[in-house]
Every structure is written in structure tokens, then in C-alpha cells.
Amino acid sequence: MSNEEINIHEAEEQLSEQEMLRRQKLVELQEAGKDPFDVYKVERTHSSADVKDNFEELEGKEVKVAGRLMSKRGQGKVVFADLADLPGKIQLFIKIDNVGEEALKEFKTFDLGDWVAATGEVFKTKMGEVSVKVTSFELICKSLKPLPEKWHGLKDPDLRYRQREVDIITNPEVKDTFIKRSQIVKAIREFLDNRGFLEVDTPILSPIAGGAAARPFITHHNALDIDMYLRIATELYLKRLIVAGFEKVYEMGKNFRNEGVSVRHNPEFTAIELYEAYADYNDMMEIMENMIAYVCEKVNGSTKVTYEGTEIDFTPPWRRITMVDAVKEFAGIDFNEIKSDEEAQAIAKEKNLEFPKPLDKVTKGEVLNMLFEEYGEDKLIQPTFLIDYPVEISPLTKKKRGNEMFTERFEGFVYGREVCNAYSELNDPIVQRERFEQQAREREYGDDEAYMLDEEFMSALETGMPPTGGLGIGIDRMIMFLTDSSSIRDVILFPTMKPQK
């Protein structure tokens, strides 16, 4: 016996009784000249929704529907069955008088999960359900694996994420979530396109991982014999396009960060970044709050949504609060009174704050930010712009007009979670180089999420970038709120999973 034959034999031994029975049915169909895998195309005339929505027009007329067989009921001379397609499901009425004895017998052998095409007349049953009175049908794909038990579906979260296709088949609300995700993405593009933004594509592979403070994925380009990074943000390339003369640009796509997995984080995620010449962070606040309101109205019909039992109101304007005021409100510490790094370090020690470098190297601004994360972040339930971040943690941002310890940067928070990040973009190449050099020192202290120096970006900045506002939004997190999903994995079709052994 060859190795291939041994492997096939071992695989067959692992099949369940139901799987073996389904494979036997397939063999019988093939021997009878009815191989479902020989079907190449189905001339479907209507979806389930088409039939139901246009019943008055279609009543008594012939249609051809197709979908997955989800239920069968009845014995003897009549069988009722439900076919599921993307919009929903349609009931089939199969009667011996209409299809013949042999055909009815054949239909009864079909398994739940099989794909069927059926032709027949549209009518309503005595119970008032729009149905198709079948005159002919065809098995167009044989399901060799049984679906999860009807009334329980696929409930184990780990299995749901690993077998998303089965999750969608058995849990209609999951399908609805991803349809809504598509609608949300479409509405975002629509909003920006209507404002004159140009959608662009920039590299995913880059020799520098820039534009954000994050740990990158590293790969190797064999032909060039260089290490490259999967992008952690699109920022630097998009700013180079502003230098080139494009005045309003955006990109929606995948970013990659080699970090942990949680209900809020997936290493591969969808984000949008947009940049507008001659604008500042105030303009970005206006764009953010009005775009989300537009999307909510478009997709949900209201700017108010319910998330985990709490009503969230996205109606503009959102609350604005400085980081200093937030720390004063939630931690009871007034940083206007803190005059030195040493004073801030003493507070950090008292509060047991942890940093990725020695405490004596930590600055006042870094302590302020950490205090907000510890005491204030989870308090911002309604949509809020946290504005004016310390300069030390905002290396790509212009300094605050009138207060050079801070920058014109904001992050948007909803339900205690960051959903966006925006700047009045730093366009002074001399200051930008100084900031990058400081970030290089941070890497020496052990902060592997500090920014890398990108000389190509610096060259572009030296060519000249006009005053610019920039905004980045985590699409997956926004979709969580608009679909009332508790985990980011619930809004990503195939989230990152540890391989099964």
C-alpha cells in the first residue's frame, strides 16, 4: 500500500458516520450520472427576497431559486423545505403530483447543507407563507460535512472564529453584522468622496515601519536581500502625497502590528487615514464627528446606538476636554501645578505607574499620559475628543499654539476606547528630525515601539508640506459600536487565531 493510500485510509477512519453516509450518497449520485460537482452554472431568476418582495407581481409565475437546504419537513406525498440564500430564505413545496414519485424520493435523500436549485410557481400556502410550488429541482453541490445541530448552531467562540463560514450559515445575525460592515465602509467612502477626497493606495511592504508607535512584523525580501516591514500605518506615504500637491487624500486598508490579541486588538486590522492640506486638528474634529453621524444615519437610521446596554449618542458636536483637565477630573491631580519631571516622577512612583524605561528617564508629559490611561480613559463613555497631548508622545505633531509643552493632537474615545487619532501635522523638517532623533534615544532605552527615522519621508518634508490636518480611524472598533459587538473578532471575518495542534 502506497503512502497516499495509507493517508486516504487514515482520513476515512476519522470521518463520522454522517460524513461516511454523505460520501456514499455522492458515489451513488455519480454512478447515476447526477454528479453535483459537474454543475457549472445555475440560471437563477430570483433571490428569496425578490420572490417575497414582489409576490403580487410574481404570483402564479415560474421562478428559479437556489440556495442551501436548511430544513425539510413532511412525509408521504408532500415535503416542505427551506432554501437559504444571502437575503434570507424561501420555502419550497414539493408534491408528488408536481414532480413525480422518483423525484420526490430523490429529494428526500438530500441532506441539510446541500445546495439545491428549484424551479416552480410562486404561491402562498394556507398559512400565508410565500413559497415556490416546485416542478423540477437539481442538486448543485453536495455537502460532505453536516451542519451544527439546528437549534444550537455553532456557539463555541473559538470554533466560530475558526469556521466562520459555518458560523455565518448557522447564525444569521453574524451574516447581518458583516453585511452592515460593508455598508459602513461604503458610507465612509461616500462621505469622503462627497467632500472631494481622493482615495489612494500606498505600500504595505516598506523598508521602514513608520507613522505610529507600534511593534512591526518583519519579513525578508529575497531578491533585494533586505528586511522589510508590514506597515503599521499609512501616514508617512500619505503625507508625501500632500507634498506632491494632492490636497485631500485618504486610504482605507490593512495595517499590521505585532502585538497582543484581545477583545479590542487584532494584529491585522482595518484603518483609514486621511489628510487635508491647509487644515488643522479642529477641522479633523469636524470631519470625524460629522462622518460618524453620517454613517450612523445611513446604516442605522439614527445617530444614537445601543452598545452593551448603554445608549451612545454620536450627534455632533462631541465633548472636547484637554488631557490636563481630564487628569484633574478623574485622577484629582492638577498638572498645571507640576513644574518638573522630578515632581511628575514622584507622582508616578506613588501611583505605581509602569513605563518601558527607567523612571528617572520618564518625563512630565509621559506621566500625564499614563495617568490619563490609568484613571481617565475608561470614564469617557459618550463620544469625546481628548485634546492637546504632551509633545514627548506626539513626535509627528505641531506644538500647541500658545503652549509649547503640548501639541495639537486629539484622540476620540467612545465607551472608554480609543477610536481615532488626529493632528495638526508637523511640517517643519528641522524640528521633525529632532523629534525622530529623540525617538531613536527612546529605542535605546528599550522602547521597541518608538518611531523609526524615515529618511525618504524627511526628504519629502524638506521639499515642503503645507499646513495639514491628518486623521486616523480604527474601522473595526467603530464597527463594533455600530453593530453592538463586544469583541473585535466579531467584526473581522477571519480574525488571527493560534493554529490548532
Curated annotation (Swiss-Prot):
Keywords on this record?
Aminoacyl-tRNA synthetase, ATP-binding, Cytoplasm, Ligase, Magnesium, Metal-binding, Nucleotide-binding, Protein biosynthesis
What residues bind Mg(2+) 2, as annotated? 418
The record's GO molecular-function terms, alphabetically, read:
ATP binding; catalytic activity, acting on a protein; lysine-tRNA ligase activity; magnesium ion binding; transferase activity; tRNA binding
Task: Identify the main location.
Answer: cytoplasm
Pfam families this protein is in?
Answer: tRNA-synt_2, tRNA_anti-codon
Q: What is its EC number?
A: 6.1.1.6
Q: Where does Mg(2+) 1 bind?
A: 411, 418
Q: Which reaction does it catalyse?
A: tRNA(Lys) + L-lysine + ATP = L-lysyl-tRNA(Lys) + AMP + diphosphate
- Keyword Aminoacyl-tRNA synthetase included in the entry's annotation: yes
One cellular component term (GO) for this entry is: cytosol
Classification via Gene3D superfamilies: Bira Bifunctional Protein, Domain 2, Nucleic acid-binding proteins
Question: Is Ribosomal protein found in the keyword set?
Answer: no
Gene Ontology biological process terms from the UniProt entry? lysyl-tRNA aminoacylation
On the tree of life, the source organism's domain of life is Bacteria
Where are the coiled-coil regions?
A: none
Q: What cofactor requirement does the entry state?
A: Mg(2+)
Q: How is the cofactor bound?
A: Binds 3 Mg(2+) ions per subunit.
Q: Where in the cell is it found?
A: Cytoplasm
Protein family per UniProt: Belongs to the class-II aminoacyl-tRNA synthetase family.
Assembly mode: Homodimer.
Q: What is this protein called?
A: Lysine--tRNA ligase
**Species per Swiss-Prot/TrEMBL record:** Clostridium perfringens (strain 13 / Type A)
Lineage runs: Bacteria, Bacillati, Bacillota, Clostridia, Eubacteriales
Q: Which gene encodes it?
A: lysS
